[in-house]
Structures are given as structure tokens and as C-alpha cells.
UniProtKB/Swiss-Prot annotation:
Name of encoding gene: cysI
InterPro entries per the UniProt record, alphabetical: CysI (IPR011786), NiRdtase/SiRdtase_haem-b_fer (IPR005117), Nit/Sulf_reduc_fer-like_dom_sf (IPR036136), NO2/SO3_Rdtase_4Fe4S_dom (IPR006067), NO2/SO3_Rdtase_4Fe4S_prot (IPR045169), NO2/SO3_Rdtase_4Fe4S_sf (IPR045854), NO2/SO3_Rdtase_FeS/sirohaem_BS (IPR006066)
Keywords: 4Fe-4S, Amino-acid biosynthesis, Cysteine biosynthesis, Heme, Iron, Iron-sulfur, Metal-binding, NADP, Oxidoreductase
Organism: Escherichia coli O7:K1 (strain IAI39 / ExPEC)
Protein name as it appears in the record: Sulfite reductase [NADPH] hemoprotein beta-component
Pfam families, alphabetized: NIR_SIR (PF01077), NIR_SIR_ferr (PF03460)
Biological role: Component of the sulfite reductase complex that catalyzes the 6-electron reduction of sulfite to sulfide. This is one of several activities required for the biosynthesis of L-cysteine from sulfate.
Length: 570
């Protein structure tokens, strides 16, 4: 809808079953506690299957052995994924040692998976270990509350070790926003931490009794880095600094990448600029955006429920005016800001605080001991001696932050001996995939297991055309939900079926343009043949400093997506 003909503020009609479930759940309790004690199944039943998501977990099974187990008349091998709440990705070394121990002793896969939402996941937690994992997290000051389902998810914050003062201020705001928007129900504490039921009635002053219509994602961004990919998120606070000190934020609302194959009513969308606000209004504005989406978001169709669709339906100006009314402010004009990149600076960086920060490239964020590369053990050894903290980046990498000069050599020695500092190409550093098979129930094609060898092939093409020192932002996501953020890449592969992907081109290096589908449902050899030709052309015909995505648009290879709500599918 355009501004002149906005749609209805509230979509009338039959509510989705998810709305019934939330309403009947008694503020997210359901019968999870009873289900925990049912030893006849390894999973959670009925509504609890979905309710555990509000508690930071997804029920999954090992898809590699699903058919085999069905033949044996066995239920799937159910296990939970747990995602920690970790605003801004900062974790202490004491916390790291605790999660390392749990992953090694109590999960099927034994790994820690860093995610592009700056947190970690455990995969393969059997039902008997579900309560212990929450208690372990609580014992070191962590939790998994609201990291999935219809809540404000883990709040991202730019990992900028150089601008230490600015990062510290922005990180504090990421934590404050996260805390402010958390659910108030005591269900989490009662079920997992055995805290007593209190006689008071639950209330959710911000989220409401049926919570949000759909997932909601928030970031705090420090330009010129767009490492957190703001346009993938519902609500973004872009830090504006004066003399190195944070003074306020530009607010951008309504980004999001998830689509459904062939459903033209779904689209990826970049976020819209609302305006500038001084720091003191941050929490009021965050609450106003969330409550406006709570009240106006579409609860009759989950595929049309995210903030991006609400904005398109009611109009950006209408939504913005309502946020101003609820927050009791008027936005000032957007302050100037620009992005220059979104990759991590791998290796040592000295901050203005004179501390050193070591960014380690972790392919696909998967931390495990591999033959000859004991990544997990190496990080544990560093955690035992490091006095600073660890920071997970939105590129699935890890920063050993705040290293004094005197400790630098010791930490580097462990990192090198563990394979944590092995040299990789710029292309590999700028490539990313979601988890996909074997654990994700939504996966249509491989992603994490496909990426390493795929990038070997891309590296060969880059070398063939003399551009090995360059990179193309390349991402693979196993399904159109888009966790791998392929819909903000220069080259994005979106899983369609086993071994087949939709190839998207025409995004840019800084993540401000949605790529358009170039070819549908093609295999890896077909993708490589197309990219061989296009990388060759880019190498020969590009202008100085021109990225691959910008080149494909300028050369007329692909039409840029200018208004995704209307022209993404054309």
C-alpha cells in the first residue's frame, strides 16, 4: 500500500492457531513441566512443541537417520537446540568454560555453534538434559529466555574493538533494550530454575498476553561497520557520536529477509529511516515500536505478520506517527551516517584503550575439535588464562577482547597451535551459511556442510581470474527463511531442494540492497559455471574499487531491487 491509500491498522479475521496457543498457555507455561517427566517420548507434545521456543529451544531430530528410524518403527531421534540470550555477543571466560563443559558432556554433537545473531547454540540436547542446561546457564548468569518465537530476540551490537569507548556505550544500550523488552512472566524461572510460584497474577505490560504477532529483531549499529546487517532486522538504532561519545541514535524500522518460495506476497525488505532521537528517549522509542507492532501486526496470517508487512500495509508515515505519539517525542531529521563494510578484521587490532583484540575466523561458527585443529580445546585453554572477555560477532567469528600487551604472545601461541589462526582467503572470510542439515527441520538443501567445499571452488575461480586478493560477500541459506542472510549478499544461494538452490545476485558489499533471483532451482555445477563467467567479466570490466554486486547491476546483468515490496519478484 502507498501512503495515500493505507490499509487497515488492524487486520480482522480468524486468528492463527498460534494465537490460540499463546492465549491458552498461561503466560508460556503450558504443560511443559509435566511433559518433562514423560519418559515415553524424547520430545515435547502438542502446544509444548511450540511453547518451548519462547524458552529459547527448538525441538529437532537428526534428519540423516530419520528414514532409517522410521523403518525400524522408532520415533525420530528428538533433541533440542538451545539458543542463549547474549546481547551484543559478550561472554565472560568463566561462562565460556561452563558452556564448553556442557557441550562436551551433554550434547549429541559435542559442539558450540556461534550464530550470526551474536550468540551460541547447543545442538542435540536430549530431553533429560533440558532442565540441567537452563540451570547451568543460570549458575553463570546466563539464560535462554526469548531467543526464539514471538518476542524481541537476541539484541545485536556492532563488534568494534577499536572504538572501545563507543563500543562500551553502545553495548550498554543493547543490554538495556534487551532487558526492557524481555517478557515478565515467571514461567521460565518456575519451570527451569525451580523457583516458587508467586501468588501474583502475571502481566505483560509491553508484550501483552499473546506476545508479538511474530519474531522481532533489534540491533545497535556503530557506523561505518554494518557487521550486524541492520536491514535484516525489525528495529535498528544507528549510533551517532560526537567526539567519540555516543549522543543519540538514528532509528530504522522494518527490515527482514524471510520469504516463501513462489509466494509473491512475501518479500525481503530493507529498513525505513524514521529519524534521530537523543539517548534519553531510547527505551521509550523501543517500547513504542514494539507495542505498535504488537497492536497492528497481522495475527491472522503468520506469513504476513512481521513488522515489514505492517509498515507496507499502514504506511511508513502512519507507523512513524504512532511511534512518536506513544513515545511522546518528535523524531529529528536523520543525522548523516555511512557504511563502508561489514566484515570482521581478522587478526590483532589495537584499541584506543591500548588493549589488543584478536578476531579469530571460525568457519560457519562451528567450534569443535577437528583432526589437527582442536579449536574447542584451544579456546578453552585461552579462556582459562585470559582476563578479558570473548565477543561473538554477527559474522559467526570470535574476538578475544581486552588482551594486555604482556599476554599477547601467550594467547597467540595457543591460538596458532590449535588451528585458530590458520590463514584463509579473503573470500572464505566473507562467506557464511546457516546450520541447515542434519538438525534443522526446515532445511531444503545443505548449507553449513556445503559451504567449505563450495568456497574451495570459488577460491579456484577467483585465482583463475586474478582476483584472489578480493572478495565477494557470499552466503548460503538452506531454506527461504533466510537465517544465513543470503538475501543481503552479493551472491546469495537459497536452498530449494537437495542439491538445488536459487541463485540471487545484485546485493552490495555493505548490505543495503536486496539481491534479485538470477536463476532458479540450479545445481552446484550450474552455479559455478555461471559464476566463472561473471567473475571473469568482473575481473576485466570493473571500475576501480567496484564490488561484484555493484558491477552486476551496472553491467546490466541483473536489475537492482529498488522497492522490494513491489518489484522483488518481477
Amino acid at each position: 500500500m502507498n501512503e495515500k491509500h493505507p490499509g487497515p491498522l488492524v487486520v480482522e479475521g480468524k486468528l492463527t492457531d498460534a494465537e490460540r496457543m499463546k492465549l491458552e498457555s498461561n503466560y508460556l507455561r503450558g504443560t511443559i513441566a509435566e511433559d518433562l517427566n514423560d519418559g515415553l517420548t524424547g520430545g515435547f507434545k502438542g502446544d509444548n512443541f511450540l511453547l518451548i521456543r519462547f524458552h529459547g529451544m527448538y525441538q529437532q531430530d537428526d534428519r540423516d537417520i530419520r528414514a532409517e528410524r522410521a523403518e525400524q518403527k522408532l520415533e525420530p531421534r528428538h533433541a533440542m537446540l538451545l539458543r542463549c540470550r547474549l546481547p551484543g555477543g559478550v561472554i565472560t571466560t568463566k561462562q565460556w568454560q561452563a558452556i564448553d563443559k556442557f557441550a562436551g558432556e551433554n550434547t549429541i554433537y559435542g559442539s558450540i555453534r556461534l550464530t550470526n545473531r551474536q550468540t551460541f547454540q547447543f545442538h542435540g540436547i536430549l530431553k533429560k538434559n533440558v532442565k540441567p542446561v537452563h540451570q547451568m546457564l543460570h549458575s553463570v548468569g546466563l539464560d535462554a529466555l526469548a531467543t526464539a518465537n514471538d518476542m524481541n530476540r537476541n539484541v545485536l551490537c556492532t563488534s568494534n574493538p577499536y572504538e572501545s569507548q563507543l563500543h562500551a556505550e553502545a553495548y550498554e544500550w543493547a543490554k538495556k533494550i534487551s532487558e526492557h523488552l524481555l517478557p515478565r512472566t515467571r514461567a521460565y524461572a518456575e519451570i527451569w530454575l525451580d523457583q516458587e510460584k508467586v501468588a501474583t497474577t502475571d502481566e505483560e505490560p509491553i508484550l501483552g498476553q499473546t506476545y508479538l504477532p511474530r519474531k522481532f529483531k533489534t540491533t545497535v549499529v556503530i557506523p561505518p561497520q554494518n557487521d550486524i546487517d541492520l536491514h535484516a532486522n525489525d528495529m535498528n538504532f544507528v549510533a551517532i557520536a560526537e567526539n567519540g561519545k555516543l549522543v543519540g541514535f538514528n532509528l530504522l524500522v522494518g527490515g527482514g529477509l524471510s520469504i516463501e518460495h513462489g509466494n509473491r506476497k512475501t518479500y525481503a525488505r530493507t529498513a525505513s529511516e524514521f529519524g534521530y532521537l537523543p539517548l534519553e528517549h531510547t527505551l521509550a522509542v523501543a517500547e513504542a515500536v514494539v507495542t505498535t507492532q504488537r497492536d497492528w501486526g497481522n495475527r491472522t496470517d503468520r506469513k504476513n505478520a512481521k513488522t515489514k508487512y505492517t509498515l507496507e500495509r499502514v504506511g511508513v508515515e502512519t507507523f512513524k506517527a504512532e511511534v512518536e505519539r506513544r513515545a511522546g517525542i518528535k523524531f529529528e531529521p536523520i543525522r548523516p551516517y555511512e557504511f563502508t563494510g561489514r566484515s570482521d578484521r581478522i587478526g590483532w587490532v589495537k584499541g584506543i584503550d591500548d588493549k589488543w583484540h584478536l578476531t579469530l575466523f571460525i568457519e560457519n561458527g562451528r567450534i569443535l575439535d577437528y583432526p589437527g585443529r582442536p579449536l574447542k580445546t584451544g579456546l578453552l585453554e585461552i579462556a582459562k588464562i585470559h582476563k578479558g572477555d570473548f565477543r561473538i560477532t554477527a559474522n559467526q567469528n570470535l574476538i578475544i577482547a581486552g588482551v594486555p600487551e604482556s599476554e599477547k604472545a601467550k594467547i597467540e601461541k595457543i591460538a596458532k597451535e590449535s588451528g585458530l589462526m590458520n590463514a584463509v582467503t579473503p573470500q572464505r572470510e566473507n562467506s557464511m551459511a546457516c546450520v541447515s542439515f542434519p538438525t534443522c527441520p526446515l532445511a531444503m538443501a545443505e548449507a553449513e556442510r556445503f559451504l567449505p567445499s563450495f568456497i574451495d571452488n570459488i577460491d579456484n575461480l577467483m585465482a583463475k581470474h586474478g582476483v584472489s586478493d578480493e572478495h565477494i560477500v557470499m552466503r548460503v541459506t538452506g531454506c527461504p527463511n533466510g537465517c544465513g542472510r543470503a538475501m543481503l549478499a552479493e551472491v546469495g544461494l537459497v536452498g530449494k531442494a537437495p542439491g538445488r538452490y536459487n541463485l540471487h545476485l545484485g546485493g552490495n558489499r555493505i548490505g543495503t540492497r536486496i539481491p534479485r533471483m538470477y536463476k532458479e532451482n540450479i545445481t552446484e555445477p550450474e552455479i559455478l559455471a555461471l559464476l566463472d563467467e561473471l567473475i571473469g567479466r568482473w575481473a576485466k570490466e570493473r571500475e576501480a574499487g567496484e564490488g561484484f554486486g555493484d558491477f552486476t547491476v551496472r553491467a546490466g546483468i541483473i536489475r537492482p531491487v529498488l522497492d522490494p515490496a513491489r518489484d522483488l519478484w518481477d
